[in-house]
């Protein structure tokens, strides 16, 4: 499978599971993809969440997408993107209406400091299907 096919599959199936490490304990939770293309895989979380603290301490992660019988695991290192323009772009996206509402209603004292946006560049993807299970 080529990179563009992977970007298309994960963009069409934006819910993924993110694995981090909390001291020596693995942690996994569902996340929501913002964008995946040649620049990288972008998602966000709130800075008060434990996942943000875990990534800050150890930025090596694995993302797992389930795409209609195809599992795509992508490992790599996350980089924090400090861009209010990108945070605002994310808020204006139709899939992130809840963030726009939070920003406009003052849910966070400082919205831009409360949203952490991450990018994974140059990840290593592994594609799995049941048909290829024992290969």
Predicted regions and their residues:
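A short, Trp-centered hydrophobic/proline-enriched beta-strand micro-motif
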Residues: 8-23, 61-64
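General beta-strand recognition
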Residues: 17, 40-42, 73, 126
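Charged, gly/pro-rich active-site loop segments
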Residues: 73-135
